[in-house]
């Protein structure tokens, strides 16, 4: 069993309090013969830490390998400064954007919502376009927005629309 988390407690155990109702858990039954490869097909997880239980033996650092998944966008911009802190902030911004590109711009890859909030998409759009070729991505997203727009012009809070009002 793999359980994912962004935080750990002081004793090193994973802290999943910020995940709300999200299970962020995968169960895989080993065949037990040589190297095995498995990937979830209908979900993804945003995480910094992973807890592995039920593994036969002592896992090493090479026991698990993560795969980064996101909508394919090409890097078009770059940033470099003489200040290492600014360079690190830029790396964090790029990773944050990529981990939230899953056909729509999502708000968080780790919790239970992973929804395309229009406000979040709006405030990150300029940054995204400075770093990546977002033309095809936003063209598709605008079509999605148009699909949920009411006859009177009203919009939902999220696209695609899941719950709530216009």
Language model segments and positions:
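Acidic, His- and aromatic-enriched active-site or binding-groove loops in soluble protein domains
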Residues: 84, 125-128
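An alpha-helical repeat/solenoid feature that recognizes helix-turn-helix modules
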Residues: 117-123, 130
């Amino acid at each position: 069993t793999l359980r994912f988390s962004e935080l750990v407690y002081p004793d090193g155990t994973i802290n999943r309090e910020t995940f709300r109702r999200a299970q962020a858990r995968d169960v895989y039954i080993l065949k037990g013969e040589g190297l095995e490869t498995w990937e979830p097909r209908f979900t993804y997880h945003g995480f910094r830490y992973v807890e592995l239980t039920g593994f036969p033996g002592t896992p090493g650092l090479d026991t698990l390998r993560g795969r980064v998944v996101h909508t394919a966008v090409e890097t078009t911009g770059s940033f470099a400064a003489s200040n290492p802190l600014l360079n690190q902030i830029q790396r964090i911004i790029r990773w944050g954007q990529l981990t939230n590109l899953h056909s729509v711009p999502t708000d968080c890859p780790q919790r239970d919502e992973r929804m395309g909030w229009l406000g979040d998409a709006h405030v990150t759009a300029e940054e995204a376009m400075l770093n990546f070729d977002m033309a095809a991505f936003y063209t598709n997203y605008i079509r999605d927005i148009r699909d949920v727009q009411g006859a009177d012009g009203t919009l939902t809070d999220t696209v695609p629309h899941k719950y709530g009002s216009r």
